Amino acid sequence: ARFLDAPRLSSEGRSFPVTITREEIKTQSVRGKVIEPGYAWVRLSQFQERTVDDFVRKIEEVYKQEPNLKGLVLDLRNDPGGLLDAAVAISAAFLPENVKVVSTDGQLAESKAVFNASPEFYLRRGGGDPLKRLPAALKSVPLVVLVNEGSASASEIVAGALQDHKRATVMGAQTFGKGSVQTVRPLGPDTGLKLTTARYYTPSGKSIQAKGIVPDVLVDETAEGSPFASLRT
Protein backbone atom coordinates (compact mmCIF):
# COMPACT_ATOMS: atom_id res chain seq x y z
CA ALA A 1 0.00 0.00 0.00
CA ARG A 2 1.18 3.51 -0.72
CA PHE A 3 -0.43 4.96 2.39
CA LEU A 4 -0.01 3.68 5.93
CA ASP A 5 -2.04 4.76 8.95
CA ALA A 6 0.02 4.45 12.12
CA PRO A 7 -1.00 5.40 15.68
CA ARG A 8 1.21 7.82 17.58
CA LEU A 9 1.30 9.03 21.18
CA SER A 10 1.05 12.71 21.96
CA SER A 11 3.02 14.39 24.73
CA GLU A 12 -0.08 13.93 26.93
CA GLY A 13 0.02 10.18 26.33
CA ARG A 14 -3.04 10.12 24.05
CA SER A 15 -2.90 8.30 20.72
CA PHE A 16 -3.73 10.01 17.42
CA PRO A 17 -3.63 8.77 13.80
CA VAL A 18 -0.85 9.70 11.39
CA THR A 19 -0.96 8.92 7.66
CA ILE A 20 2.43 8.08 6.14
CA THR A 21 2.85 8.34 2.37
CA ARG A 22 5.28 5.91 0.78
CA GLU A 23 7.51 7.58 -1.81
CA GLU A 24 10.73 6.72 -3.58
CA ILE A 25 13.71 8.31 -1.84
CA LYS A 26 15.81 10.07 -4.48
CA THR A 27 19.40 10.78 -3.55
CA GLN A 28 21.53 13.29 -5.41
CA SER A 29 24.73 11.54 -6.48
CA VAL A 30 26.18 14.44 -8.50
CA ARG A 31 27.21 17.87 -7.28
CA GLY A 32 29.31 20.53 -8.91
CA LYS A 33 30.05 24.20 -9.43
CA VAL A 34 32.42 26.67 -10.99
CA ILE A 35 35.11 27.15 -8.33
CA GLU A 36 36.88 30.08 -9.94
CA PRO A 37 36.86 31.68 -13.41
CA GLY A 38 37.64 28.97 -15.96
CA TYR A 39 37.70 26.03 -13.53
CA ALA A 40 34.95 23.73 -12.26
CA TRP A 41 34.53 20.85 -9.82
CA VAL A 42 32.10 17.93 -10.22
CA ARG A 43 31.67 15.30 -7.52
CA LEU A 44 30.15 11.83 -7.92
CA SER A 45 29.19 10.22 -4.61
CA GLN A 46 28.07 6.92 -6.19
CA PHE A 47 27.08 5.37 -9.52
CA GLN A 48 23.28 4.97 -9.54
CA GLU A 49 20.62 4.70 -12.25
CA ARG A 50 20.21 8.49 -12.32
CA THR A 51 23.90 9.36 -12.07
CA VAL A 52 24.61 9.68 -15.79
CA ASP A 53 21.60 11.94 -16.43
CA ASP A 54 22.45 14.03 -13.37
CA PHE A 55 26.07 14.28 -14.51
CA VAL A 56 25.06 15.49 -17.96
CA ARG A 57 22.76 18.12 -16.47
CA LYS A 58 25.50 19.33 -14.14
CA ILE A 59 28.03 19.59 -16.97
CA GLU A 60 25.46 21.55 -19.01
CA GLU A 61 25.04 23.94 -16.07
CA VAL A 62 28.80 24.36 -15.72
CA TYR A 63 29.32 25.16 -19.40
CA LYS A 64 26.37 27.56 -19.40
CA GLN A 65 28.00 29.47 -16.56
CA GLU A 66 31.56 29.09 -17.89
CA PRO A 67 31.54 28.46 -21.69
CA ASN A 68 35.34 28.74 -21.94
CA LEU A 69 36.19 26.12 -19.35
CA LYS A 70 39.96 25.73 -18.91
CA GLY A 71 39.97 22.80 -16.50
CA LEU A 72 37.72 20.36 -14.66
CA VAL A 73 38.15 18.35 -11.46
CA LEU A 74 36.21 15.06 -11.29
CA ASP A 75 35.99 14.18 -7.60
CA LEU A 76 35.59 10.44 -6.93
CA ARG A 77 36.85 10.46 -3.34
CA ASN A 78 34.88 8.17 -1.02
CA ASP A 79 32.72 7.02 -3.94
CA PRO A 80 32.06 3.31 -3.21
CA GLY A 81 30.99 2.58 -6.79
CA GLY A 82 27.74 1.16 -8.09
CA LEU A 83 26.53 0.31 -11.59
CA LEU A 84 28.98 -0.82 -14.26
CA ASP A 85 27.06 0.80 -17.13
CA ALA A 86 27.18 4.15 -15.32
CA ALA A 87 30.95 3.84 -14.93
CA VAL A 88 31.31 3.08 -18.65
CA ALA A 89 29.12 6.08 -19.54
CA ILE A 90 31.00 8.53 -17.32
CA SER A 91 34.28 7.30 -18.82
CA ALA A 92 32.85 7.61 -22.33
CA ALA A 93 31.93 11.25 -21.65
CA PHE A 94 35.65 12.10 -21.67
CA LEU A 95 37.16 9.46 -23.97
CA PRO A 96 37.24 9.00 -27.76
CA GLU A 97 34.42 6.81 -29.01
CA ASN A 98 34.86 3.04 -28.88
CA VAL A 99 38.14 2.89 -26.95
CA LYS A 100 38.34 0.23 -24.24
CA VAL A 101 37.06 1.31 -20.81
CA VAL A 102 37.32 -1.93 -18.82
CA SER A 103 37.42 -5.68 -19.32
CA THR A 104 36.55 -8.70 -17.21
CA ASP A 105 38.37 -12.02 -17.19
CA GLY A 106 37.85 -15.28 -15.33
CA GLN A 107 38.05 -19.02 -15.77
CA LEU A 108 34.65 -19.35 -17.45
CA ALA A 109 33.98 -18.22 -21.01
CA GLU A 110 31.02 -16.05 -19.97
CA SER A 111 33.22 -14.13 -17.55
CA LYS A 112 35.36 -12.72 -20.36
CA ALA A 113 34.05 -9.41 -21.71
CA VAL A 114 35.21 -6.02 -22.97
CA PHE A 115 33.32 -2.76 -22.38
CA ASN A 116 34.06 0.13 -24.74
CA ALA A 117 33.22 3.82 -24.77
CA SER A 118 30.25 3.25 -27.03
CA PRO A 119 26.48 3.66 -26.43
CA GLU A 120 25.81 -0.07 -26.81
CA PHE A 121 27.75 -0.65 -23.58
CA TYR A 122 25.88 1.84 -21.39
CA LEU A 123 22.46 2.60 -22.90
CA ARG A 124 19.44 1.22 -21.09
CA ARG A 125 16.64 -0.41 -23.03
CA GLY A 126 14.34 2.16 -24.63
CA GLY A 127 16.44 5.14 -23.58
CA GLY A 128 18.32 7.69 -25.64
CA ASP A 129 21.98 8.57 -25.30
CA PRO A 130 22.31 11.35 -22.69
CA LEU A 131 25.96 11.92 -23.62
CA LYS A 132 24.86 13.47 -26.92
CA ARG A 133 23.83 16.56 -24.95
CA LEU A 134 27.36 17.13 -23.68
CA PRO A 135 29.48 19.90 -25.22
CA ALA A 136 32.18 18.62 -27.57
CA ALA A 137 34.78 20.55 -25.56
CA LEU A 138 34.41 18.06 -22.69
CA LYS A 139 36.42 15.51 -24.70
CA SER A 140 39.53 17.68 -24.50
CA VAL A 141 39.20 19.92 -21.43
CA PRO A 142 42.16 19.43 -19.05
CA LEU A 143 41.01 16.99 -16.38
CA VAL A 144 42.08 16.00 -12.87
CA VAL A 145 40.48 12.99 -11.14
CA LEU A 146 40.58 12.95 -7.34
CA VAL A 147 40.63 9.55 -5.58
CA ASN A 148 41.39 8.15 -2.14
CA GLU A 149 41.17 4.93 -0.13
CA GLY A 150 37.37 5.19 -0.19
CA SER A 151 37.18 5.19 -4.00
CA ALA A 152 36.11 1.69 -5.03
CA SER A 153 34.62 -0.45 -7.80
CA ALA A 154 33.01 1.79 -10.46
CA SER A 155 35.13 4.74 -9.28
CA GLU A 156 38.27 2.72 -9.91
CA ILE A 157 37.02 1.70 -13.35
CA VAL A 158 36.60 5.37 -14.33
CA ALA A 159 39.90 6.48 -12.81
CA GLY A 160 41.76 3.57 -14.39
CA ALA A 161 40.31 4.17 -17.86
CA LEU A 162 41.04 7.90 -17.83
CA GLN A 163 44.54 7.27 -16.50
CA ASP A 164 45.44 4.53 -18.98
CA HIS A 165 44.26 6.59 -21.95
CA LYS A 166 46.21 9.58 -20.57
CA ARG A 167 43.01 11.59 -20.59
CA ALA A 168 43.37 12.79 -17.00
CA THR A 169 45.84 13.26 -14.19
CA VAL A 170 44.76 11.05 -11.30
CA MET A 171 45.56 12.67 -7.97
CA GLY A 172 45.16 11.59 -4.34
CA ALA A 173 45.75 8.31 -2.52
CA GLN A 174 45.78 4.69 -3.76
CA THR A 175 42.21 3.45 -4.17
CA PHE A 176 40.44 0.62 -2.34
CA GLY A 177 40.99 -2.24 -4.82
CA LYS A 178 37.46 -3.60 -5.31
CA GLY A 179 37.81 -5.18 -8.71
CA SER A 180 36.03 -8.52 -8.49
CA VAL A 181 32.87 -9.70 -10.25
CA GLN A 182 30.37 -11.76 -8.25
CA THR A 183 27.85 -14.18 -9.73
CA VAL A 184 24.93 -15.70 -7.81
CA ARG A 185 24.30 -19.39 -8.55
CA PRO A 186 20.78 -20.46 -7.51
CA LEU A 187 20.70 -23.52 -5.26
CA GLY A 188 16.96 -23.71 -4.67
CA PRO A 189 13.78 -21.62 -4.48
CA ASP A 190 15.07 -19.36 -1.71
CA THR A 191 18.82 -19.94 -1.63
CA GLY A 192 21.83 -19.10 -3.71
CA LEU A 193 25.62 -19.11 -3.64
CA LYS A 194 27.57 -15.96 -4.50
CA LEU A 195 30.91 -16.71 -6.15
CA THR A 196 33.71 -14.49 -7.40
CA THR A 197 33.87 -15.40 -11.07
CA ALA A 198 36.02 -12.69 -12.67
CA ARG A 199 38.15 -9.61 -12.12
CA TYR A 200 38.07 -6.15 -13.63
CA TYR A 201 41.06 -4.96 -15.66
CA THR A 202 41.95 -1.46 -16.83
CA PRO A 203 42.50 -0.84 -20.57
CA SER A 204 46.24 -1.52 -20.21
CA GLY A 205 45.52 -4.86 -18.51
CA LYS A 206 46.15 -3.93 -14.86
CA SER A 207 44.01 -5.78 -12.33
CA ILE A 208 42.01 -3.51 -10.03
CA GLN A 209 41.41 -6.20 -7.39
CA ALA A 210 43.37 -5.62 -4.16
CA LYS A 211 45.81 -3.31 -5.96
CA GLY A 212 43.50 -0.43 -6.77
CA ILE A 213 44.53 2.56 -8.85
CA VAL A 214 47.82 4.25 -7.99
CA PRO A 215 47.50 8.01 -8.64
CA ASP A 216 49.85 9.85 -10.97
CA VAL A 217 50.28 12.39 -8.18
CA LEU A 218 50.17 11.09 -4.60
CA VAL A 219 48.67 13.69 -2.28
CA ASP A 220 47.93 13.53 1.43
CA GLU A 221 44.33 14.69 1.88
CA THR A 222 45.42 16.81 4.83
CA ALA A 223 47.97 18.63 2.70
CA GLU A 224 47.31 22.17 1.62
CA GLY A 225 46.99 23.04 -2.02
CA SER A 226 44.57 22.99 -4.90
CA PRO A 227 44.05 20.38 -7.63
CA PHE A 228 43.66 23.27 -10.07
CA ALA A 229 47.43 23.79 -9.85
CA SER A 230 47.88 20.62 -11.94
CA LEU A 231 45.48 21.96 -14.55
CA ARG A 232 47.47 25.16 -14.97
CA THR A 233 50.82 23.47 -15.64
PLM regions with names:
Residues 1-188:
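Cleft-lining beta-strand/loop regions that shape enzyme active-site pockets
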Residues 192, 199-233:
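Conserved functional hotspot residues or short segments at active or partner-binding sites
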Residues 14-16, 38, 189, 194-196, ...:
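A generic structural signal for well-ordered coil/turn residues at beta-strand boundaries
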Residues 147, 197-199:
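Generic secondary-structure microfeatures
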Residues 65, 108-109, 126, 194-195, ...:
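Short, intrinsically disordered/low-complexity patches at protein termini
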